[in-house]
């Protein structure tokens, strides 16, 4: 999947281009596969692996908090199935703000998802995380819970919810995607 890096905010766009180039200089090809993500796409990812009860409870919580657009995003995408991939609700991932990028490692022309496999003594995801931090990005592979090796983001704050109120997030998502 081609990712349009121009959809990322200016402050991260050049940095992630440098990140990919720096990895390449170390013999590691990293290819972008997720940049800007709509809150509807985030809702699909969050819903997979969760029970109906958990989903209904979270929709109710969002409505009670006055975050009607976020609740609508979560409710409107319908049932989703799959392994857990995120704890971030719609609006609560930096992807929705254009401040995060996911890349996969390319080995012999194929996507390689292993975080332990080494080629020429290097694991692509570990190189990617190291290089990201050299550029003052936050690397998801170094998180303590639900490690997300393909993910890098501009801010150190793990979530927009750490620096914005739920109402600010709801308003921001409605303005961008509503």
Model-derived features: positions:
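Cell-envelope/glycan interface and biosynthesis
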Residues: 1-166, 170-178
